[in-house]
Amino acid sequence: MSARIIDGNALAARVRGEIAARAAALTDRGTQPCLAVLLVGENPASAVYVRSKVAACEKAGIRSLRFDYPQDVDPAVVMEKLAALNADPSVHGILVQLPLPPQFDEAAVLEAISVAKDVDGFHAENVGRLSQNQEAFLPCTPHGVMKMLEAEGVPLAGAEAVVIGRSNIVGKPMAMLLTNAGATVTVCHSRTRDLRFHTGRADIVVAAIGKPRFVTGDMLKPGATVIDVGINRITDGPEAGKLCGDVDFASASEVAGLITPVPGGVGPMTITMLLENTVISAERSARAAGK
């Protein structure tokens, strides 16, 4: 068996076209969607992510505001900026790029963002709404995965799904979204015993653990849908510098029915969902203003 590859770039391009049309319609009515991005420190990976988000905004017709702070900035300065952005009606989405330097309380920073502008979906109220299957801004990576599964027509109701990883950013919300869709979900992590037992019976496997090529083909049920959320850079050997996921693509693609590549799989959809959340926020703002 050779798995069919889920092309995240193609799906993202299609969805971004729809988002751009919605953004243009809003702008024509006097409300241009706007995303504010705050970057603290000089983490190279964070800087790359922020540049990608800003560039994606520009292409979609979404205005972006970028605020950069030094590594040693007083957290009070950032909190003051968040308060100002919360109060600015022209700003519809606010994103603080993680991770933050050690002097910050990340949870407090995320809670300081207005729920109505929390386009990353990390505020406790949005997480709570997700857990109750209520309308909420959804975390972008799990939301992107759900869009991919929907686009591929993967049956979720009654499916056995395994999520490997329990982070607040991916693992936990991913499990909640799959549960809300009717799947029977098992969350596995570093203390899970006999991981192969769980993955071997799963119709859907979502790998989000940050370990290069950890999930191999012999761990999978034939025909399974495999979603690789990981992105790792190989640091040594002949493949040094190359990006790979948490799934060993070569072996897994011989067993799976559907599989996402790295790069070009989940990554493009993550930023796409950020754009969609920003436009949704702007649409709500326009409706409230009678535009």
Curated annotation (Swiss-Prot):
InterPro entries: Aminoacid_DH-like_N_sf (IPR046346), NAD(P)-bd_dom_sf (IPR036291), THF_DH/CycHdrlase (IPR000672), THF_DH/CycHdrlase_cat_dom (IPR020630), THF_DH/CycHdrlase_CS (IPR020867), THF_DH/CycHdrlase_NAD-bd_dom (IPR020631). GO terms for molecular function: methenyltetrahydrofolate cyclohydrolase activity; methylenetetrahydrofolate dehydrogenase (NADP+) activity. The keyword Transcription regulation does not apply. It holds the Pfam family THF_DHG_CYH_C. The keyword Hydrolase applies. GO terms for biological process: L-histidine biosynthetic process; methionine biosynthetic process; purine nucleotide biosynthetic process; tetrahydrofolate interconversion. One of its GO terms (cellular component) is cytosol. It catalyses: (6R)-5,10-methylene-5,6,7,8-tetrahydrofolate + NADP(+) = (6R)-5,10-methenyltetrahydrofolate + NADPH; (6R)-5,10-methenyltetrahydrofolate + H2O = (6R)-10-formyltetrahydrofolate + H(+). Keywords: Amino-acid biosynthesis, Histidine biosynthesis, Hydrolase, Methionine biosynthesis, Multifunctional enzyme, NADP, One-carbon metabolism, Oxidoreductase, Purine biosynthesis. Pathway: One-carbon metabolism; tetrahydrofolate interconversion. NADP(+) binds at G165, R166, S167, S190, I231. Its EC number is 1.5.1.5, 3.5.4.9. PROSITE patterns: THF_DHG_CYH_2. NCBIfam families: PRK10792.1 (NF008058), PRK14186.1 (NF010783), PRK14189.1 (NF010786). Homodimer. Catalyzes the oxidation of 5,10-methylenetetrahydrofolate to 5,10-methenyltetrahydrofolate and then the hydrolysis of 5,10-methenyltetrahydrofolate to 10-formyltetrahydrofolate. Belongs to the tetrahydrofolate dehydrogenase/cyclohydrolase family. This is Bifunctional protein FolD. The gene is folD.
